[in-house]
A protein has these predicted regions:
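Flexible "cap/lid" loop of the alpha/beta hydrolase fold
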Residues: 30-31, 38-70, 133
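Acidic catalytic loop of the alpha/beta-hydrolase fold
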Residues: 126-127, 151-156, 181
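Short alpha-helix in the alpha/beta-hydrolase fold that links the catalytic acid
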Residues: 133-135, 143, 157-166
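Catalytic active-site module of serine/aspartate enzymes centered on a nucleophile-bearing elbow/loop
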Residues: 169-206
Length: 206
């Protein structure tokens, strides 16, 4: 809200939240519905409690105090698939980020101590596992919404989509075949097309 007020944005805004960002924009929209024109999710966290996954195990370990100090070094790579670097899951999209570009971005962000700390702090203090109540409340509000998810997501299992559709009946959705959690930069043509269509549709309905 502070940023919106500072920028003197009077019209309603369109929000997009990816992974951890899903519950974050969802909470904002839920608390400030008069400021939001649409809320759009990309493989949002929040239903991970419904299923045991590798990421759940890593996140729960962070609740053990003496482990936090040591796991903070490797936490980002664990969340990105359990490797020391990120590898694109597919090369079929000609508009994808190249592997070299991705490696460069990954190495750069890992140089910042605050990056790792922020991820660890978010995992420890923000409920990534279960934000179902928030999604249920948001689903009762008349806010345009959409979600895109990969059916092979290894970080945030795509079966969360069924729960999300139940809690948010009017949400527009797209399930991308064989797409994993890196769909934003591995399959940007699909994600970009879906989001642009949703935002255009929501804007025309204003």
């Amino acid at each position: 809200m502070e940023l919106i007020d500072y920028l003197k944005i009077e019209q309603k805004v369109h929000l997009i939240g990816y992974s951890m960002g899903g519950p974050i924009v969802g909470h904002f929209a839920n608390e400030n519905p008069n400021k939001v024109e649409s809320v759009n999710f990309i493989a949002p966290a929040g239903y991970m409690f419904k299923r045991k996954s590798q990421s759940n195990v890593y996140l729960k370990i962070l609740n053990v105090p003496f482990i936090t100090k040591y796991i903070s070094v490797v936490f980002p790579s664990l969340m990105y698939g359990g490797n020391s670097s990120i590898k694109l899951s597919t090369d079929e999209d000609e508009n994808r980020l190249s592997q070299n570009e991705l490696n460069a971005v990954y190495r750069k962000q890992m140089k910042y101590e605050g990056f790792t700390r922020s991820l660890v702090s978010t995992a420890k203090n923000f409920n990534l596992f279960n934000t179902q109540k928030m999604f249920q409340e948001l689903g009762k509000k008349n806010i345009n919404s959409s979600v895109i998810w990969g059916d092979a997501d290894e970080v945030v299992p795509s079966d969360g989509l069924n729960y999300l559709k139940s809690d948010y009946p009017n949400i527009n959705y797209k399930l991308v075949k064989n797409a994993r959690h890196d769909l934003t930069y591995a399959l940007p043509s699909i994600v970009g097309k879906f989001l642009s269509e949703q935002l255009l549709s929501f804007s025309n309905n204003e």
